[in-house]
Every structure is written in structure tokens, then in C-alpha cells.
């Protein structure tokens, strides 16, 4: 039989989370962000759950082609724009909208010969200092684009650096409003964190919102708030089984480096999951895990193919017992991916994207 580890994607939960995002901004259209292969879930696996989106936002042409191949005829936005001039031809052929964030991209458009004018989102660097034109240069970039016959419509967008934290977004909203005042076109500034935390503000919702991590059941502001606090459902479950049981005595150690020492008699289960499956190696003793739907903890260091769990809360568990590394157990109990990520010093986004190719994936509602 195959190794018992399995990832399960839940399209119904994806759909629920999309509707949750829409409730946060009922008067705006929603971009479903499916970059990085839908945050590791697989674009094709989540597509049915996202059909109700108003558009799909992603990073590259290959992802755009996959969405079109699924039958989507609505808007698709390239969040980083094109990476070289020849990409513009495929944008025309596929009917893609694309961000413009630098002078070179404007130059490429000016030299592009096309019968199909492009719809673009002009990106502002309102303080994150990643991509986009500074507020001081934004209007001149807009004027250059507006003069091009290759450009049909210009929308305005920016990205928040601190929507999930105490610094907030007011300073960036102000910079964006000042620089775009009186410019025509649609606006898009809210990401998942802004949508959930600041979506009640009409100055944030605007015409479009970008729903990213919120679609995949992770809280953008964990641990301040949990996914359940935002009514988000887990969209990925990583589960395995116990393949070995050991009975420890006081003084026995577990795993590489002997990082855990038993203080007395202790039953542990050995689970078929390790860092080669995408489980974070930095998750030390105490990381939450579910065995037969009962919450317990990991023991010792995570190795390439295995990890150990404390069986004290589930004394009847033995070979073949269900182990939920994150997501929803068979009995309905939920272990948020954010809690596991926090124990490993990272974020839920990274765990989703890091699921290893050797892990089988199924789709199940």
C-alpha cells in the first residue's frame, strides 16, 4: 500500500471563504488571487469553489493560460505585469489585464503593435517600497499611459504593508487618494487583511478587492485573530497515520539530537510525515496535532519522513490511528494551519505553498 500521508483540498470551504470575503465588501467586485498555484492548493482543484469570483488575479502567463483552459472568460489580472515585451502579445491573445509598475513596462507598451488595446492597472508604491511608482511620479506615469493608443483603460491600484498590524493603512490610503484625485478609472487597494480588518471603510473597498489568503482559510492577522474569528474554513487538510508506537521510560530520549527527554512513562506514536512532505522542521516539541481528532502535541525533532506525537490524551490510539497535521479531522475537529505555522516560526501561507510534490492530493467536499 502507499505511504499513508494525504493532502485533501476542500472546494466547498474555498467557496465559503469567497462568500465571506464578498460579505466584507458587498459593493465591490472580488479578485480571487490564485498566484503560486492557488497558494499551493492547485488552481484546477479550487476553480469550482471560485467560479463566483468576478475575476482571477495571478502572477504569470502560464497560470493565466491554465485559468483560461478551465473555461474562464472573465477578467484575469497579472499582478506584477509583464516581464518582457513579448509577453504583451499573449496578453492581447488571452485578453489579460495587467499591472504597470515601472517605466520599462510603459516603454514596452509604447513599442507594442496591437489591434487590441490593453487594460492596465497602474501600480502605486504608497509605502511598501516593492513595486510601483511613488506618489510624486504617479500622475506623470498615468499621463504617459493615457497618451498611448495601445492602452484602452487605466485603473489605479496599490498594496498595503501593514494592513494586518497596528500601524494600519491610513497613511497609505491618504497617499493613494491624494495622488489619484480626479483621475478616471477604477480603484483597487484592499488585500485580505485590509478587507477583513478595514472593509467597513468605503475608502478601502472601492471598486475591486483582492481576496488572497482569506480564500484559503488562514487568518492574515494570526495570532491576534484566528481563522474561526473571521468565519473562515480550512481549505487544505494534511493527514497521515501512526506507523509505529513506542513506550518510553524516564530518561528515554526521542529523535535526532535527543531534544526531548521523557520524565516518566510515556506512550508516543510515530507518524508518517516529515519535512520532506512540507511539514516545518522547526516545529519543536509542543506543536499542536490531532490524533483521532483529539488535540495533543509533537515530541522531539521533526525528521525527513517521520515525527513523533504524545499519545497521553489518546491512550487507545495505535497503529493506523488518524493524525491531522493541519486542517479538519474525520470527527470534524479543526487544527488551524496558522497554529502549526506559528510553532514553526512561519506563517500559514508558507506551509500551504511548501506542500511537497511527493504528497498525494485529493479533492473532497
Curated annotation (Swiss-Prot):
The modification N6-(pyridoxal phosphate)lysine is found at residue 35. Pfam families: Ala_racemase_C (PF00842), Ala_racemase_N (PF01168). InterPro entries: Ala_racemase, Ala_racemase/Decarboxylase_C, Ala_racemase_C, Ala_racemase_N, Ala_racemase_pyridoxalP-BS, PLP-binding_barrel. One of its GO terms (cellular component) is cytosol. Pathway: Amino-acid biosynthesis; D-alanine biosynthesis; D-alanine from L-alanine: step 1/1. Keywords: Isomerase, Pyridoxal phosphate. The keyword Isomerase applies. PROSITE patterns: ALANINE_RACEMASE. Substrate binds at residues 130, 304. GO terms for molecular function: alanine racemase activity; pyridoxal phosphate binding. Catalyzes the interconversion of L-alanine and D-alanine. May also act on other amino acids. This is Alanine racemase. It comes from Acidovorax ebreus (strain TPSY). The lineage of its organism: Bacteria, Pseudomonadati, Pseudomonadota, Betaproteobacteria, Burkholderiales.
Amino acid at each position: 500500500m502507499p505511504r499513508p500521508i494525504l493532502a485533501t483540498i476542500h472546494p466547498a470551504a474555498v467557496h465559503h471563504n469567497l462568500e465571506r470575503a464578498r460579505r466584507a465588501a458587498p459593493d465591490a467586485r472580488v479578485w480571487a488571487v490564485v498566484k503560486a498555484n492557488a497558494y499551493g492548493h492547485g488552481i484546477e482543484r479550487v476553480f469550482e469553489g471560485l467560479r463566483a469570483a468576478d475575476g482571477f488575479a495571478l502572477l504569470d502567463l502560464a497560470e493565466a493560460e491554465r485559468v483560461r483552459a478551465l473555461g474562464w472568460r472573465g477578467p484575469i489580472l497579472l499582478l506584477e505585469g509583464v516581464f518582457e515585451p513579448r509577453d504583451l502579445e499573449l496578453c492581447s491573445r488571452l485578453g489579460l489585464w495587467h499591472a504597470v509598475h515601472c517605466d520599462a513596462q510603459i516603454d514596452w507598451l509604447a513599442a507594442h503593435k496591437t489591434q487590441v488595446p490593453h487594460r492596465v492597472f497602474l501600480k502605486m508604491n504608497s509605502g511598501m517600497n516593492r513595486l510601483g511608482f511613488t506618489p510624486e511620479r504617479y500622475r506623470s506615469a498615468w499621463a504617459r499611459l493615457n497618451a498611448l493608443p495601445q492602452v484602452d483603460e487605466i485603473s489605479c491600484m496599490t498594496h498595503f504593508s501593514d494592513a494586518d498590524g497596528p500601524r494600519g493603512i491610513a497613511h497609505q490610503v491618504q497617499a493613494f487618494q491624494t495622488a489619484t484625485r480626479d483621475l478616471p478609472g477604477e480603484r483597487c487597494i484592499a488585500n485580505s487583511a485590509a478587507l477583513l480588518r478595514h472593509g467597513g471603510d468605503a475608502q478601502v473597498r472601492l471598486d475591486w478587492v483582492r481576496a488572497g489568503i482569506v480564500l484559503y482559510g488562514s487568518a492574515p492577522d494570526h495570532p491576534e485573530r484566528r481563522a474561526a474569528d473571521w468565519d473562515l474554513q480550512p481549505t487544505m487538510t494534511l493527514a497521515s497515520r501512526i506507523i509505529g508506537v513506542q513506550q518510553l521510560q524516564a530518561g528515554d530520549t526521542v529523535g535526532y539530537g535527543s531534544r526531548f527527554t521523557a520524565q516518566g512513562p510515556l506512550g508516543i506514536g510515530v507518524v508518517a510525515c516529515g519535512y520532506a512532505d512540507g511539514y516545518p522542521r522547526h516545529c519543536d516539541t509542543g506543536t499542536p496535532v490531532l490524533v483521532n481528532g483529539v488535540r495533543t502535541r509533537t515530541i522531539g525533532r521533526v525528521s525527513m519522513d517521520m515525527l513523533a506525537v504524545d499519545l497521553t490524551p489518546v491512550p487507545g490510539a495505535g497503529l493506523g490511528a488518524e493524525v491531522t497535521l493541519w486542517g479538519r479531522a474525520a470527527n470534524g475537529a479543526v487544527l488551524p494551519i496558522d497554529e502549526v505555522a506559528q510553532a514553526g516560526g512561519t506563517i500559514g501561507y508558507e506551509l500551504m505553498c511548501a506542500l511537497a510534490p511527493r504528497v498525494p492530493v485529493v479533492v473532497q467536499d
